[in-house]
Each structure stands twice: as structure tokens, then as C-alpha cells.
Regions:
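Alpha/beta-hydrolase fold nucleophile elbow
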Residues: 153-163
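Conserved alpha/beta-hydrolase
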Residues: 104-126
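The serine-hydrolase catalytic nucleophile loop
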Residues: 92-104, 119, 266-267
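Alpha/beta-hydrolase active-site loop
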Residues: 131-152
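Glycine-rich nucleophile elbow surrounding the catalytic serine of serine-hydrolase chemistry
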Residues: 162-173
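N-terminal cap/lid segment of alpha/beta-hydrolase-fold proteins
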Residues: 37-78
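Active-site glycine-rich loops that stabilize anionic/oxyanionic intermediates
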Residues: 81, 88-93
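The alpha/beta-hydrolase serine catalytic core
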Residues: 68, 169, 179-326
């Protein structure tokens, strides 16, 4: 019996020692003054760089009874950062087809804060898609800008916008003297109802959608798997983003891709480029730089290119452009 008791005691002691070691190994590491590097993965797969950026998912109060799910990306140090807002397209989300996280982290590494919201009915938004409207997105941009300037040491003077497709239209309609620079990827910037040509490629089809929405309050768009509201279509019909673009005096980067033809007309490309060329100042014109890219800036099938190559080019372009525009502007204040 004594041997049995001794064995039992030894086994008990051994278990206690092992448990203590396991508990110590599970303790979280002490906080460091420098955040751990982030290895970015985007549309092109694992990236070839590490970032010191701080990335957080937050829920921003719109002030209108709902939350705006957003991702913020901050520099690891400093203050009075310029701010960039990244605007996704129709039925998209704040990941921006995989492009926005890398753009945001590269900008943060250069000292620029970024925020990417999910617009109503998109991504993690709790709202129905029928709440997706131009006026709602304008208000959401105002809310996220105000939040960033209140919650973080963000400059009140220096603001950049990036917009893809419908996000490009939203960014363009937001242009005024407060916006330092804007980067537009394949903006859906045709005038009036031609602006929702991605819902119907014919004028007759667009008019039918508008009239049905006016009669029923909303209209289903089976090709996109969503129902849009009368408000959305009427606001599109009444808006003229190129008039706002023509009046804007700040730096602009513009890109279009060969694959845009599935969503946007040649008339849209011509109108936007003609508008920018009519201004008194030059712009970064990348309209012919993506013959191998889809509307979402991945490689077209049989193009001989790769998603990684297209992604690197479309993602790096606004980083250099916005860093030059925003950091120079920040230094002047």
C-alpha cells in the first residue's frame, strides 16, 4: 500500500508541474511598443511585403440609426495623419475585391490613415440593399470622416478618396474643396440614367427599370441578385458626376480596364477622360494601361498576364499618387 501511495504522490506532483508549464506557455506575450508586422494577402494571393500598419474592424455610428461596418488602417506611429477613404463598388464590400487592404497598409506605412466602410446592403451592413442610395453613401462618407477625425489623430485638412466603379461615382460626387486628391478606378460616371448602364445596357431597359421602380417603390435586378429602390434610381438619374469632376481643382488619378466593357460603355470612358482633359490642370491618365484586366482588376482569361501582375499595378498606382499629393499638402499646412 505504501508503494502505491508513493506512486500516486509522484504522479500527482508530475501533473502539477506539467500543468504549471502549460499555463505559463499559454500566457499572452507582453505588449510591445511596436505592433507585430502584418503579412498582407489580397486578390493576388500572399503579398511580398510586411507592414507595420495597425488594422482594426470597427462599427461606426452613422447618427441615423444604424452602424457602418468599417476597417481602419493606421500608421504605427505619429499623428496628424492625412486620411484616405476607400469606396467599394455596387454589391461589393470594404475589401474592395481584395485590393483595398494592401492599398491601405502601404499608405499607412507612409504615414496615411485609411478607412474602408461597407455601404448599406453590402458586406457586413445590417441594412437591406434597398437602403443603398447615393444620398445614403454621401452621408456615410461624412460619418466615417467625422469619426476618424474624432477618434484618431487624423488631419482635419488633408483628405483623399479612392473609388472603384460605383464607388468612383460616389467619390466623384463627394468632391469639393475639402478633398485634396482622388483616385478613380473605372468610375461609373456617366450622366443621369446612363450611370446605371451596368444594370441594363440599353436606354430602353434603363427607362423601364426607372418607371417600374417609380410604380412599385423598388425593382428587382435578377442579373445582380439584388433589389434596388426608387430612390437609388432617381438619384442616379438626377446626378451628374462629371460636372462635379470638371469643377474639381485637385489632383486626379484615372484608370480604366479593357474588361470594363462588360459593365461600362465606351461613352462613359470617353466622357470621363474628356472631362478631365478639359480642366486647366493635368491628371494621371491610366486609361490605356490595363488591356489585360477585368473590371475588378484581375487578369482577363487568355490575356497572358496574371492576377498578381495586374493587382500590383492597380494597387501601387494610388499609393504613390496619394502619398505625393497628401503628404506634400500636409507639409504645407
Amino acid at each position: 500500500m505504501k508503494r502505491t501511495n508513493h506512486a500516486f504522490l509522484w504522479m500527482t506532483l508530475l501533473c502539477l508541474v506539467l500543468a504549471g508549464c502549460a499555463a505559463r506557455s499559454a500566457d499572452p506575450p507582453a505588449e510591445s511598443s511596436s505592433p507585430a508586422p502584418v503579412v498582407e494577402e489580397g486578390a493576388s494571393g500572399p503579398a511580398d511585403f510586411e507592414s507595420s500598419a495597425i488594422v482594426e474592424d470597427v462599427s461606426i455610428d452613422s447618427g441615423r440609426g444604424y452602424a457602418i461596418p468599417s476597417t481602419i488602417t493606421l500608421p504605427a506611429s505619429g499623428q496628424d495623419w492625412p486620411l484616405v477613404v476607400l469606396c467599394h463598388g455596387f454589391t461589393g464590400n470594404r475589401n474592395g475585391d481584395g485590393h483595398f487592404p494592401r492599398v491601405a497598409r502601404e499608405l499607412a506605412d507612409r504615414g496615411i490613415a485609411c478607412v474602408a466602410p461597407d455601404f448599406a446592403g453590402n458586406g457586413e451592413s445590417a441594412l437591406p440593399f434597398t437602403d443603398y442610395t447615393l444620398s445614403g453613401m454621401y452621408d456615410d462618407l461624412e460619418s466615417v470622416i467625422a469619426y476618424m477625425r474624432t477618434a484618431y489623430p487624423v488631419s482635419s485638412e488633408t483628405l483623399g478618396l479612392v473609388g472603384h466603379s460605383m464607388g468612383g461615382r460616389v467619390a466623384t460626387l463627394h468632391l469639393d474643396e475639402r478633398v485634396t486628391a482622388v483616385a478613380l478606378w473605372s468610375p461609373a460616371n456617366n450622366t443621369g440614367s446612363d450611370g446605371f448602364e451596368f444594370l441594363s445596357h440599353t436606354a430602353e431597359g434603363r427607362e423601364e427599370l426607372l418607371q417600374r421602380a417609380r410604380t412599385e417603390g423598388q425593382v428587382e435586378v435578377p442579373s445582380w441578385g439584388v433589389t434596388v429602390s426608387k430612390t437609388f434610381l432617381e438619384e442616379m438619374d438626377e446626378s451628374d458626376p462629371c460636372a462635379r469632376l470638371e469643377a474639381y481643382d485637385g489632383p486626379v488619378l484615372l484608370a480604366f480596364a479593357a474588361g470594363d466593357s462588360e459593365v461600362l460603355s465606351d461613352d462613359t470612358v470617353a466622357l470621363v477622360t474628356r472631362t478631365l482633359r478639359s480642366r486647366d490642370r493635368s491628371f494621371v491618365d491610366m486609361t490605356g494601361d490595363f488591356p489585360e484586366a477585368t473590371h475588378n482588376y484581375t487578369a482577363l482569361p487568355d490575356s497572358g498576364s496574371s492576377d498578381a501582375a495586374v493587382c500590383r499595378r492597380i494597387e501601387s498606382a494610388p499609393v504613390g499618387f496619394l502619398a505625393d499629393a497628401l503628404l506634400t499638402d500636409a507639409d504645407s499646412h
